[in-house]
Amino acid sequence: MTGAGTAATSNLIRSLRAGADSLFIVGAHSDRFFLRKSSADANYLLPDLTHPRFFPALRRVLAKERIDLLIPTTDAEVRALVRPGRRLPCRLFLPRKAVVDVCQDKYRLNVRLRSRGVPVPATYPVSGLGAIDKTFRRLADHERVWCRIRVGSGSMGAIPVKRAEQARSWIAYWDEMRGVPATSFTLSEFLPGRDFSCQALWKAGELILTKTCERLSYFGGGSQPSGISSVSQLAKTVREPRVVEVCAAAIRALDRRASGTFNFDLRENARGVPCITEINVGRFASGTNVFDLTGQHNLAATFVRVALGRRVDLHEEYDAAEGYYTVRDLDTLTGVFRTDELFDRIVDARE
């Protein structure tokens, strides 16, 4: 497992140990400081993903430890592993390269899904600073507009704006200070409704298992210009069949033989329709515990079983475990609580 020692990988390891405690987990990272925090059974320091020696070193580790399955934890790793010619002495369970390429460009994804009738926000690419006024006129029916970078994660470069000059100044700042050109941005309708996350597992075009949650507050949201982030601080499990239907339609629009895990971000539009804003393809959400430590099925552990060719008696299973909350904060273990546990060991002294 890559990214050993990071919050995302540590959460994933926690989930796997809860669902399949006999697993021997090997962690790897290119940063020795993160690696020192890893909870894996064995840990290896690798060159950076961009270094020519990365894949030779990775192959040596995979062979030495007789690894059965490699699980990437970042978009860059997923992108690198699906390239043609990447021969590894173990299994991968990832979507096809064409699917990864589309999903990792939010505008391309938006165009593909819209053309297939899947709900997405109205979105336009920025061709240059001089074209922003024209785009705003196309979005004139919306009080606010969402300005964002079309690649990457963590809500990088995302901000709500009301006027064209706000978007122009924001994009110009990123160009001058961070080297991100105007053409890397999109402008779209602002979605004002509820914010959902969905994780789904597919194999050969068959939906196996889906889980959903709703983000209620955001980690670091108060310090973000947008007031939100893709990382929830407080989330709850929910039963939302509409969300599952939209996500399933999206995958079928992308690949009729889809395999792997897909993490969806969705938000309701003004009419209450859940719209897909992005799909993190081939990897788990950093807050995967909400999907793995609740309900009848541990999604991460099920992923491993399916990836290794084990039989699982699940077909289009929607494991909606209502009544759980997760709480996340810096340098603390993710808390997973049932509703009836929220006030355990708490005395109300407000009166």
Where are these regions (language model features)?
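ATP-dependent carboxylate/phosphate-activation module, predominantly the ATP-grasp catalytic core
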Residues: 165, 169-175, 182, 188-195, ...
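ATP-binding N-terminal substructure of ATP-dependent carboxylate-amine bond-forming enzymes
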Residues: 1-95, 130
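Conserved hydrophobic "DFG−1" position in protein kinase catalytic cores
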Residues: 160, 189, 200, 266-268
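Preference for protein termini
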Residues: 1-31, 65-66, 179, 204-206, ...
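ATP-dependent carboxylate activation and anion-phosphoryl transfer catalytic cores
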Residues: 65, 219, 239-351
